[in-house]
Amino acid sequence: MAIAKVIISNRQKEVKIPTGIRLLMRRCCQAVLQTEGFSEPAEVSITFISNDDIRKLNAEFRNVDAATDVLSFPLGENGVYDRNPETGALLLGDIVISMQKAEQQAEMYGHSLQREIAYLTVHSVLHLLGYDHVNGGIEQVHMREREETVLAKLGLQRDASYVNE
C-alpha cells in the first residue's frame, strides 16, 4: 500500500480553514492512491490560495484569465515520476485550491466546505496521476467514475455532507 506524504500550506486569508480539513485531505490522497493501486511512497503538495492568485496562475498556465476552483501541476508523465532524493518518495505534483471558489461551490451545491475540499483534492490527485476530463468523452466519464468511487469509499458520496464535529 502506498504511503502519501501530503504537504499542505495556506497562503490566503479570505476563508477560514475548517478544523480537521488537513486530515481529511490526507485521507483523500491516500484513498486515491489506494484505489489506483499505487504501491510506492508518494508526495503531494497542496496550497490554499486566493481567487486573485489562482486567476493569475490560470492565465499564466492555461491562458484563461478567470479564477477557477483548483489547478493541478503534475510532475510526472505516463506514470514516470522523479523521486525525492532524501526520502525516495515519488513526487506526484502540486495542487492549488482557491478557498473562495471552494466556499462558493459548496454553497452552490448545498454541501459543506469540507465535502467540497475533499472532492477537489480527489479530483486533483487523479489529474496528478494522468486522468483528464478537458476533452470530454470517455476520458471524462472514466475520471468522474474514479472520483465517485474514491469519495464513496470515504463516505463522501454526492448526497453526503461531511461535517467534522
Question: What do these predicted ranges mean?
Answer:
Residues M1-A118, L126-E165:
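An acidic/histidine-cluster motif and surrounding catalytic segment
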